[in-house]
Amino acid sequence: MALRCKTPAATCAARSRRSVRVSAHKGAFEQAQVAAAAFVAAAVIAAPANAGVVLQQPVLKKAFQDDTPAAPPPKREFRGLAPPALPQSDAPNVAAEKPKKAEVVESTSGGLDPRSVALPGALALTIGGFVAASKIDGSFNDWFMEAVVRDSNNYAGYEATLKSENGVTFPKVAAGGTKKVKAATGSKKGGFPFGGKK
């Protein structure tokens, strides 16, 4: 301390005893949050949204393959009995190589995409057709309700126990039971007491 301070020792001691005051204002954290949110909103709004369509496909590289074609395997000749060779034609094969067509990518610049109108248009057409049919024919609403809403009093057609006059009827339990059932239930009658006392 003596090396740094060339003034009297009392002044150096006073400087080293300085205290730092830290005060927090109410709402400082909220102000920082609002400032950060405003900065992010300004950055997002100001950034251009270039969601363009890529019209050319990138050329893919073959990482694990050589660019040179593989050498053809050597021909093995059989010098014994060989079938006769067919005559070779000297004319080049015209249909062998066809020129490749360039890929055409169509994009709609501007305008309205039909897919964004299809579902709302179909819903509007259906509801509009229903309203028009009900205005033209007064009995259309009755016919529609009869066709769509099923009367639940008829059930599905196969619930014989539900259609009976007494409502649901349970089958009767046989009076006697096997010895194992009687022993398992602990009753002399046997069976399980489903519908109350027996």
Curated annotation (Swiss-Prot):
List keywords of the entry alphabetically: Chloroplast, Electron transport, Membrane, Phosphoprotein, Plastid, Respiratory chain, Thylakoid, Transit peptide, Transmembrane, Transmembrane helix, Transport
The text of the family note is: Belongs to the petO family.
Cellular component annotations (GO), alphabetically ordered: chloroplast thylakoid membrane; cytochrome b6f complex
Q: Where is this region: Disordered?
A: 65-111
Q: Which organism is it from?
A: Chlamydomonas reinhardtii
Membrane-traversing stretches: 116-136
Function, as annotated: The cytochrome b6-f complex functions in the linear cross-membrane transport of electrons between photosystem II and I, as well as in cyclic electron flow around photosystem I.
Topology, Stromal side: 137-198
The protein here is known as Cytochrome b6-f complex subunit petO, chloroplastic
User: Which branch of life, at top level?
Assistant: Eukaryota
| Record-level GO BP terms | photosynthetic electron transport chain
How is this chain modified after translation?
A: Phosphorylated.
Q: List the disulfide bonds.
A: none
Query: Which locations, inside or outside the cell, does it occupy?
Result: Plastid, Chloroplast thylakoid membrane
Chain ranges sitting on the Lumenal side read: 52-115
Q: What is the lineage of its organism?
A: Eukaryota, Viridiplantae, Chlorophyta, core chlorophytes, Chlorophyceae
Record: transit peptide: 1-51
